[in-house]
């Protein structure tokens, strides 16, 4: 329940204003707990001082990675320890062993290899030296059997052409840092999904393919399952693991690796694929950028039930069941179909455009809250990717709420309540549209497509934050004023 900020302060003398500083605030009170400079103000030095990664709150201390080493502070600001492990970008902690792991980016030292350091509870380095890993580390998981590390070579997740990227999976001995596998399993592409399961690890490849390996690195499937490219969804269902890619969908038996449906649902490659579950009919509803399908969860029998065209060449971003009807939307488009795919309405409102949009931040509060959740999950020792149950509201929102409920403070209890609200079906869609007078904010009913509320501002470059959970609009009305509207 702390907010940690690093940068340069605007107050103080000239030397203080150009010296990097860290400040810690209490989220419950909004008051500053303490602050400190990373170097002595006014002191001439050739060393660069800066915070290099996210700070972590753990074991009644705040651990801060900097360009000159890792620093641990008490909540009152006392320095508990510091070491010389420089340029750590990511910190992970293990509650069971009271151990700290830090990842140093190879790019910061002109290397193609990232480096992993292990520290004890007092910041002392536990391994003789950091363990070098080929490529950029994209996934780091602490398990009871060892440390699983996925790294991406030749550009990794930031590469434009996914086919040029290839991942490696390593499994390290937590005691020594040595690789426990004589031979790493073949990936033949970029690892897009990576989950710990009961008997090993399950992973999906961006170029297509799903495989499961044991904790000793052996394949548990007879052969990797071939899938379409870009696996957008991997989730558990009563029938097995459902996967949805940019061009196909099926369910896998996780014990055998065989598909449950005799034939996969195949469709023309789509930039966006969204899905939901119709509990009443026992069908998955899958929507591509132009076509909607209904699939029987048990047999895999499917049929195309609707086709559509989004204005402004938008792609669907959300789908949900509204009773027996199907709601499909993007930023500026809203569709409602009955359960047979017959169109009930289509509403479209022209977007403000890039020049008019300014710094509008739709859903910024929800995004910030999700990022905070991910950080707290790592701090709590739950730094594992989550293979959730496929359900009507989605596993991620449910996990967000569960994570905060385990943190016993008023601020996080309030956050849990907000996430519970986000799990519940919302009845309206909020969008911005261009009007003759400026930019208008519309609140529309998902069930009817009708306008429920409207707000227009003459500001050509408005700054908004919309809290879609509690239905508030925060609007910067001038340089010193933030106005709040109930929407």
Q: Where do the protein language model's features map onto the residues?
A:
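Secretory-pathway ectodomains
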Residues: 1-487
């Amino acid at each position: 329940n702390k907010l940690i900020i690093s940068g340069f302060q605007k107050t103080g003398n000239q030397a203080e204003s150009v010296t990097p500083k860290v400040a810690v605030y209490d989220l419950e009170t909004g008051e500053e707990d303490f602050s400190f400079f990373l170097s002595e103000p006014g002191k001439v030095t050739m060393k660069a001082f800066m915070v290099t990664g996210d700070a972590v709150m753990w074991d009644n201390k705040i651990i801060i990675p900097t360009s000159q080493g890792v620093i641990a502070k008490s909540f009152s600001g006392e320095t508990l320890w510091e070491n010389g492990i420089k340029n750590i970008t990511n910190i992970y902690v293990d509650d069971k062993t009271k151990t700290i792991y830090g990842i140093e980016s190879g790019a910061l030292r002109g290397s193609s290899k990232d480096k992993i350091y292990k520290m004890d509870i007092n910041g002392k380095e536990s391994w003789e030296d950091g363990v070098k890993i080929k490529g950029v580390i994209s996934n780091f998981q602490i398990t009871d059997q060892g440390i699983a590390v996925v790294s991406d070579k030749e550009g990794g997740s930031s590469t434009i052409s996914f086919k040029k990227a290839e991942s490696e999976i390593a499994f390290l001995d937590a005691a020594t840092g040595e690789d426990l596998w004589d031979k790493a399993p073949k990936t033949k592409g970029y690892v897009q999904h990576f989950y710990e399961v009961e008997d090993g690890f399950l992973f999906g490849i961006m170029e297509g393919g799903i495989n499961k390996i044991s904790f000793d690195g052996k394949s548990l499937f007879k052969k990797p399952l071939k899938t379409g490219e870009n696996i957008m969804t991997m989730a558990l269902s009563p029938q097995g693991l459902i996967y949805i890619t940019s061009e196909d969908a099926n369910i896998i038996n996780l014990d055998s690796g065989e598909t449950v449906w005799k034939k996969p649902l195949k469709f023309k490659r789509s930039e966006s694929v969204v899905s939901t579950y119709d509990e009443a009919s026992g069908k998955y509803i899958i929507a591509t950028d132009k076509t909607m399908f209904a699939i029987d969860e048990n047999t895999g029998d499917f049929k195309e039930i609707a086709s559509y065209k989004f204005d402004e060449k938008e792609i669907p971003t959300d789908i949900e069941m509204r009773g027996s009807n199907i709601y499909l939307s993007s930023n500026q488009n809203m569709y409602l179909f009955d359960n047979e795919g017959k169109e009930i309405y289509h509403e479209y409102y022209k977007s403000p455009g890039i020049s008019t949009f300014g710094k509008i931040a739709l859903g910024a509060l929800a995004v910030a809250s999700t990022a905070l959740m991910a950080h707290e999950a790592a701090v709590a020792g739950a730094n594992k990717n989550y293979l959730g149950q496929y359900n009507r509201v989605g596993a991620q929102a449910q996990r967000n709420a569960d994570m905060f409920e385990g943190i016993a403070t008023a601020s996080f209890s309030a956050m849990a309540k907000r996430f519970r609200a986000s799990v519940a079906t919302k009845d309206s869609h909020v969008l911005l549209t261009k009007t003759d007078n400026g930019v208008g904010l519309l609140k529309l009913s998902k069930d009817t497509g009708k306008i429920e509320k409207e707000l227009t501002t003459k500001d050509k470059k408005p700054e908004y934050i919309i809290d879609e959970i509690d239905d508030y609009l925060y609007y910067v009305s001038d340089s010193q004023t933030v106005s709040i509207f109930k929407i």
